[in-house]
Amino acid sequence: MFSFTEAKSKISLWTRSAAPLNNVYLSYSCRCGLGKRKLAGGCCSAPYITCYDSADFRRVQYLYFCLTRYCCLYFFLLLLADWFYKKSSIFFETEFSRGFRTWRKIVKLLYILPKFEMESIMSRGIPSGILEEKAIQFKRAKEGNKPLKDEIPKPEDMYVSHTSKWNVLRKMSQKTVDLSKAAAGMGFINKHMLTGNILAQPTTVLDIPVTKDKTLAMASDFIRKENLKTSAIHIGAIEIIIQSFASPESDLMGGFLLVDSLHTDTANAIRSIFVAPMRGGRPVRVVTFPNTLAPVSCDLNNRFKLICSLPNCDIVQGSQVAEVSVNVAGCATSIEKSHTPSQLYTEEFEKEGAVVVEYLGRQTYCAQPSNLPTEEKLRSLKFDFHVEQPSVLKLSNSCNAHFVKGESLKYSISGKEAENHAVHATVVSREGASAAPKQYDPILGRVLDPRNGNVAFPQMEQNLFALSLDDTSSVRGSLLDTKFAQTRVLLSKAMAGGDVLLDEYLYDVVNGQDFRATVAFLRTHVITGKIKVTATTNISDNSGCCLMLAINSGVRGKYSTDVYTICSQDSMTWNPGCKKNFSFTFNPNPCGDSWSAEMISRSRVRMTVICVSGWTLSPTTDVIAKLDWSIVNEKCEPTIYHLADCQNWLPLNRWMGKLTFPQGVTSEVRRMPLSIGGGAGATQAFLANMPNSWISMWRYFRGELHFEVTKMSSPYIKATVTFLIAFGNLSDAFGFYESFPHRIVQFAEVEEKCTLVFSQQEFVTAWSTQVNPRTTLEADGCPYLYAIIHDSTTGTISGDFNLGVKLVGIKDFCGIGSNPGIDGSRLLGAIAQGPVCAEASDVYSPCMIASTPPAPFSDVTAVTFDLINGKITPVGDDNWNTHIYNPPIMNVLRTAAWKSGTIHVQLNVRGAGVKRADWDGQVFVYLRQSMNPESYDARTFVISQPGSAMLNFSFDIIGPNSGFEFAESPWANQTTWYLECVATNPRQIQQFEVNMRFDPNFRVAGNILMPPFPLSTETPPLLKFRFRDIERSKRSVMVGHTATAA
């Protein structure tokens, strides 16, 4: 047990301070269970103390202390402690007093504390040096977490002040300063001006404000009668503060450019470049010193731009990544008093240029570009000075006067070494000139014209012609300057749907025209702007119709002008009853970014205007619509279809059909199939265009569908239509269509178009591009676009409510698998045809087949296959039995204007069933680009194998237009590819079959208007036999039976 004397000695040891304890709890054990006591601010020098962190139950057991023997010393120390308790005013009033009262209780309780042995006490204690180190670390952390301050220097540190004390006092009394009225030479600083937010996108551009908008001088129509004040501002320093919202442990990096938008040259515009991490936590601070003088105007806050780039941003697109604010310090200047930079600014700040303040060891980089002139650059410059005096009216006689051009001064300074004289001047006088002969000046080395005083440069020197005569730039200017043609289209009062109103080559539109840009259109070699068509007409308000203007890259044969065929490349539908004018732009070169008049002439670009839907109410007279053709300053962009790459946006322009709803309360239903890989047409023939043929290359597809719906009747006829996606097994009597996800479109009087978007969430899986024409609607298993009258169709005039639906394109297109093909076609927009191979497979599509004549005229016969245009031409004998299939690969080759890539060909040669010893036949195969006898063969093959043989080879289509080729086009003398087969014994060599497939690098662009492709009802010739009346399902049986019999 402790004695009272021992307890008092503990107090004496406690008052002798050795090391302060901050936030350390000392605890003891006693029988009465007294809790912990905090002795913050106290002292402890005992070597045997048990210390615990503040998170635990802190317990300090006071060990066996050596008690003092002298009672006088004890009472002296007790009185001294009591005096400190009462007189101290700093910390003892709180911490020490609390501890002192605790020790008074401890003195009373020490009598009942157990007596511990010295060994157990030493095993529980720790050295007091640990407590000292923790106190030092706490002090360092407390000092390191101070609030961040602005790093921008003060104006008085950057400039030498020239303002009077009165101006300084007046500035202090004003909350808002009008910069135009501020005293010249007065520095200013604007802090924490919000710039904007950095978004999660590739590039973000933010304006750097120099001052608050309300401090900018406003435009005024009067001038105050006072001395001129501030006219410009010197921008000395800009501090950009970027508060990132990203995670503090992310690897997000940001690149930033401080750009002066006054310059157009990149080398002069970029003022500072810096890269910094975009982690959250402490903000990124960048201090730049532009040292730029800017005039006070309303555009002051738009001059400097901050361009942000996030290369590895993983934040959701469009979200806010960081918030940007700026601090700006500068000085007001005028024509009387300019700014005077301080020595600190010129020697330190201006030399530094820009600096990124680093926090927590972040990786930051900063660069300050410079574009100072060099001696080599100075030599390449040429300074031209040209000053002309105004014209003077001169009196010729009493009844006549004329204007005479005044004198002009021309002065040129050039550093080119090619010129003998870098500096030359000419003064020209226009009056009193005589027709004196030209003479050569040996000093100038030029021919002088004494009449006008001009210096005549020889034509072999390029300086005179470099600025004007060899100008190859595109046509530019206003609509009046770029208008090159105008076309009149007659809208007959008897116009009906399907009528062709205008169909001619685009080049022929210019013939006979005499507008400002007509000559420029015809004579410019390279035109980079798109062609704009503006159509205007004015019809009665109660009438309506629908016209379509379409542009296609070419035509072949007796091509079809059906709306399904012509709208696939560039087209626009227009209802003059709803909209009196319309315009659209197009690129006549679909696989390049430039074109010329000669190019569209020789490639035969076709322009067609047709009537899709006739008059709702016929006008009393014919109507004229005018088309104005011009070149706009909009860069041409190619539209290329890639086989290997899944395109983000696949333009289709597929005409889904014309929907007619009669007036009344009946709920009419119209359905349009989304198996859009095939053509459309009538019985025994089908129409094909390039985009639909291209999409049929895949067996299945999926994507986000974008439809354009156009009102094609009078605006006085109204209806509300519901559009939805469902399968074809729904009958017209099904009354719960709107239980599916649907869109309701209410067409107003002047509502002409609307866009419908069906995302991929509408479809659980992909679906087939083609469906067999014999399959019923209940069994095809593919989605349909439904259009149902929501309420009723009504109007103040008689007539039907007509809608035109066009599938504009597919976003995020995904093609799946290889399409084996279907031969057949339904009516418009139903089903398609054909076989094809996918990019990753070796599936060949049957394209063409030819059988030798049963009774050949000679021992040598030949046939030529046009591999691109899909034609078979027998040579010397017309009794060949030929058949052309309609697979998607053939449809693409025939309907695509421009093609590029590799085509793999498989030629199967089948012979008669004779003995090998009796075989006496050879086949010579020639791959040619032209059938002219002067052209050489590209490849030559010889087949002498008995029975049958298979030949595999490939060829590349590479053309002059960005690698694309237009087969047999007069432009650039382009050719096509032919495969000529010559058989020496046609009685033994009986059949040639050509199969083809595309390589994954194959690409196409542009559409060719083609005639309808016939559908053959005959079975293709069979091996060794020619049965025309058997079913396809029996072919394998017949062939197998024949083989067994043989």
From Swiss-Prot:
Changing V259A: Complete loss of GTP binding. It holds the Pfam family Como_SCP. The record marks Q459, M460, Q833, G834, L1022, L1023 as: Cleavage. One of its GO terms (biological process) is transport of virus in host, cell to cell. Residues 409-415 are annotated as: Involved in tubule formation by the movement protein. Changing R476 to D/E: Complete loss of RNA packaging and decreased capsid assembly. The record marks R476, N633, W649 as: Interaction with the viral RNA. Signal peptide: none annotated. Keywords: Acetylation, Capsid protein, DNA-binding, GTP-binding, Host cell junction, Host nucleus, Host-virus interaction, Inhibition of host innate immune response by virus, Nucleotide-binding, RNA-binding, Suppressor of RNA silencing, T=3 icosahedral capsid protein, Transport, Viral immunoevasion, Viral movement protein, Virion. The modification N-acetylmethionine is found at M460. Changing D260A: Complete loss of GTP binding. One of its GO terms (molecular function) is structural molecule activity. The record marks F1025 as: Involved in viral capsid assembly and RNA binding. The keyword Acetylation applies. Residues 62-84 are annotated as: Hydrophobic. It comes from the Viruses. Changing R476 to G/K/W: No effect on viral yield and virus systemic transport. The keyword DNA-binding applies. Changing R1026D: Complete loss of capsid assembly. This is RNA2 polyprotein. The lineage of its organism: Viruses, Riboviria, Orthornavirae, Pisuviricota, Pisoniviricetes. GO terms for cellular component: host cell nucleus; host cell plasmodesma; T=3 icosahedral viral capsid.
